[in-house]
């Protein structure tokens, strides 16, 4: 039961509306060493919108601000000015407890390095966000975790530890872990950087599956033009500014404007 006066976590609808806005950035700026002679602004007034149906690539040269932006969106850091809204709720005024709850329930993270806990089984790693949030998982949650392992192609691997899995299999566990809370937004930072092309394609297909079936918006940082071209839209970050937000042609030959550019 929630604490009196405490808002519930932001969670996606079980029957999702693909047009629901998941993320909105309004004139977001980020500076370091504020007020000092060494102050430097790394993000310059960014505006961006993502809907549940969006599957977007975030591209840009090293040092363009991609990781900084992902940290802000993922509530791992706060902007110097501007506002970030998740499912319509402003995040800059959230206290630490609220930010932690939202981050744990509404945002999924997948990184280049999977960061699995070596002493835990694959299933225990998948259930870790639920363990952190509420203690011992229920039988229903364990069944959901096993279902996710099956979804990512690891049926029968629940009791294996990371050192008994290949690199690609470990990354699949990380994907299942990111999705166990049914987040409204999935942030993926170079998730296929250490994988061979076949495994990278498999991981990408998993992201696409959850985007379409569960209305989980995806923002994927990648340096691989082959992968970014398969996303619905590509957001280009140059020297801390969004310089392009373009729709990619769909397989059916139609092109939709990215939601960030829709009225």
What would you call each of these model-derived segments?
Residues 106, 143, 171, 242, ...:
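A generic membrane alpha-helix/interface feature
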Residues 234-247:
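H-loop (His-switch) and adjacent beta-strand-loop-beta switch element
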Residues 1-31, 244-263:
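ABC-family P-loop ATPase nucleotide-binding domain
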Residues 21-230, 234-237:
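ABC family nucleotide-binding domain
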